[in-house]
Amino acid sequence: MNDLNIWKRAERIRKLLGEDSSSPIDLFALTNSINGLSIVNYPMGENISGMCVKGKHSNVFAINSLMTLGRQRFTLAHELFHLYYDNEPSTSICLKNIGAGNEKEIQADQFASYLIMPPLALTEMIQKLKESSSGVITLNEVVFLEQYYQISRQAVLYRLIQERELSHQDAEKMRQNIIQSAINLGYDDTLYKPSPLNKRYRTYGHYIKLAEKVLEKGLVSRGKYEELLLEAFRSDLVYGEDIDEEILD
Amino acid sequence: MDKALINLGTKLKELREQAGFTQSNIANFLKVDQSLVSKIEKGERSITTDMLERLSTLFGVSVATLLTRYVEEQTMSYSLRAKDIDTNDYEMISAIHRIALNSDFMTEKLITSSKEDNDHE
């Protein structure tokens, strides 16, 4: 499949999710709104970024919660490719290295990159940034882009190399002091950190609604309901932990 | 030899090979000796319900599917080599499949209940 087809697919998914073809998107909110999809945060090994399970009736994305939030967003976009465009296996386990692995994985990474940073919008943005930086992309522009699209440094560098806006050599230098470079420009560091400790194991979305429904309809006992929640790492819902003081504003 | 054991062994071997796991990977995951996995695959040894349950979540199939003879389709696809998956990742795969299987269990409960409601009307 060529890049144009992958771009078209990314565009189609943006449309499906109710997004225009140029703005930054909130992938955590968007994936949570997909019918029948559960998202699981789980600390995985260092080579794995995520997993997509296409079940008989519903689907599950698992995201490596030890990766930075920016990288987690890229993985969510990558798993969307498996969900919508990978017809073969029911379970895909995905590599952490962007642009590596088999053909499907490389396509899924390209799709993720286009979904988050649509080619036309990115080109325009790069032009604008270059106008105010003597025609070259520097670390400042890289930080701007990763903050604008809320995505990891690695994902931005990968794309800028592809777009021939950065050399491998220049990109390499930008792979260090990531947090400091963002802080120095006045940004918050949340993007560069993993999920908070109390949310590294957690299931969101469809699964929780299903559990509530089967309990409400009397289709499972309270004991079974609690077991289902505990197996999905939602002890907070069983024991009432972690509920912060509510503010209505 | 027990025909059911042979069927289960054949099924286990097929699923394991499709997923690219070795007998040793399965043995580590089940915390048993590799020779036991080999014997189970040959239908020479029985399997505990606990092991059956753990294998079903590792492969993301129901226990019933594990006990039926045919493997209908590929169940797992890895973009990484088995050596890139560490021991804890087998637990991870199993935990995530558990969630997917639970989702199917809950959905099937709802479907059955809705069918029963329709039949009563």
Question: Model-derived features: where do they sit?
Answer:
Chain A
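Active-site hotspot residues in diverse enzymes, especially metal/ion-binding acidic/histidine motifs
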Residues: M1-D249
